[in-house]
Structures are given as structure tokens and as C-alpha cells.
């Protein structure tokens, strides 16, 4: 798994295209040839851009679900609803399909935010609200999520 780093502000043109920032393109160099998968986020009103290798890993996990369990089928259907294969063109632009742009309220000003191994694509105002709303709770969240992690191999304890 490659870790993606950075938060970048961009603009979307009238056709729904955005220019991938150069620092992000450099990090995704290998993925540029393989393509990406773009989908709705499960928890937020944003989009998730998966490098194809990361998407394949996610699909390996999902393929382990028993398809004879109704809620597994419901999850798979909803998780993959609206999923699109996306390529970055020769000029470095990425086209956001209209239905996904509507879901995430992507119109003009957007934020590309790294989320470990994927990129979240946010409407700028919604991103700032999501970050601002969680500032007070972040210390508690960090303690709850990471406080019990004891992994000296990576320096987390």
C-alpha cells in the first residue's frame, strides 16, 4: 500500500473536469497508467478516488463476504452503486461524472484530500465544514481510535 500525502485545492471546469495537482500526480505516477475507481463515500458527502491496485485490494475483501447473506448483498450493492473507472487524460485532467458530482455537491471549488491510500474529493465548503465541525472532538476521537494501539514496530505506543 502506498501512502498518499497532502491536501490540495482545485477548480472544476464547466464540464466537470479537474486538473490533477503536480505533487499528487508525482505520488500517483504508477497509478496513472493503471487507472482509478471513483465512488461515493460511505460516511461523508464526498467522493473517493481509489488507485486501481487499492480498489482491487478492497474488492478482494468484499469478495470474501457470503453472498447468501442478504445484508452482505445489500452492502455490496450500495457500496458499489455509481462506481466508475476513471482515467487521467494526457493533459492531467480527471472527469467527474455528473451523477457523482451531484452526490458530492461538486461544482467549482474543490479539495483533494489524502486519506491514507485513497483521495477524497470534496466540495470546498463541505470539506471546511467537516473539518471545522470535528475540531473539538478530534482529541477524543484520536484517543478512542489510536489510544489502544500498541505497535512499537511503527513507533506507535
Curated annotation (Swiss-Prot):
PANTHER family: TRANSCRIPTIONAL REGULATOR MRAZ. The gene is mraZ. Its main location: cytoplasm. This is Transcriptional regulator MraZ. Belongs to the MraZ family. The lineage of its organism: Bacteria, Pseudomonadati, Bacteroidota, Flavobacteriia, Flavobacteriales. It comes from Flavobacterium psychrophilum (strain ATCC 49511 / DSM 21280 / CIP 103535 / JIP02/86). GO terms for cellular component: cytoplasm; nucleoid. GO terms for biological process: negative regulation of DNA-templated transcription initiation. Residues 7-54, 83-126 form the SpoVT-AbrB domain. Keywords: Cytoplasm, DNA-binding, Repeat, Transcription, Transcription regulation. CDD domains: MraZ_C (cd16321), MraZ_N (cd16320).
